[in-house]
Amino acid sequence: MTDIKSMNLTEMAAYFKELGEPAFRAKQVFQWLHRGVFSFDEMTNLSKPLREKLAASCILYAPQVERRQVSALDGTIKYLWRLRDGNCIETVLMRYHHGNTVCISSQVGCRMGCAFCASTLGGKVRDLTPAEMLDQVLFTQMDSGAPVSNIVLMGIGEPLDNFDTVLRFLELVNSPDGLNIGMRHISLSTCGLTEKIDKLADYQLQLTLSVSLHAPDDETRSRIMPVNRSVGVEKLFAACRRYFEKTGRRISYEYAMIDGVNDADWQADLLARHLKGTPGHVNLIPLNNVEESPLKPSRRVAAFQKRLESHGITATVRRKLGGDIDASCGQLRRKTMQQEHT
């Protein structure tokens, strides 16, 4: 079966040529798919024989809403989707004054092993396809009735560990014949795969790269983020500098504030030294509690921010959304998995 929704327009045109159909059919089907149509029968400008041919040869699967949580505080919606193979992923819709942002997953599970993240518990199961990533945006938009203006790849999984798929997804959502979401409205988060950061820089995409840093020194970062053991903080910051030089895009550094682990003044001072001379922004994140983790939220967020700012570093505190639901990454999926195995 052909995964037609993962195709770009050029590939789709070639596919229709193989079927003996005119190339313009590809654009018609592409536009239907990117409007959120999940049945060839709904594509009313196609002939019935062609619709039947496509239905017999192509995968077109709508993800099922396993659970939906809506925050009474701010309207944030957390979705748990059931995929066609039975696996589950999460998507979060966040409402801001500037528009609606959807946070999507790039993998089923994650193999990065970060100590403070629920999505890595149980490891990585598999990569998502471009279609499965796109469906999160389309279905969230359809279900909520909220048009999506911004996308963040900060859900379950390490996007750069699924590099080619993520690039294709970015191409699809950026297409003028699809959702046409501009690259400057897309953020991609990585825990710091330096070779992939360099590879991404070569494409010179105008998206925002968000580096999940969480500690400025190797001892601390290696303890809470195993990926650092093979990379190191110096190599990571060097890759970030190269990325900025190639793309001209300022990097956002994500920093989850953990009590007694990464919130000391000396760590703020060290972080500031790393960032001197390279435009960047530090996003301080109040830690979400994970039941299986002993790590606790820091009470020094404001002090840490002030310390960074005293060095001339731009630092903000992430607004916490969905505080009354399982809105942080991997929590809802983890709870569902535990329930299914009891």
Residue locations for each model-derived region?
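Glutamine-centric residue-chemistry signal
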Residues: 28, 107, 133-136, 305
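Auxiliary Fe-S-binding modules of radical SAM enzymes
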Residues: 1-89, 241-250, 255-342
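Canonical Radical SAM [4Fe-4S] cluster-binding loop centered on the CxxxCxxC motif
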Residues: 95-132
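P-loop NTP-binding catalytic core
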Residues: 85-99
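A short, flexible beta-alpha/helix-coil linker loop
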Residues: 35-36, 119-124, 217-218, 287-291
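Conserved alpha-helical substructure of the radical SAM core
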Residues: 121-150
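Generic beta-strand structural signal
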Residues: 77, 89, 100-104, 112, ...
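Conserved AdoMet/S-adenosylmethionine-binding subsite of the radical SAM
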Residues: 141-150, 155-311, 315
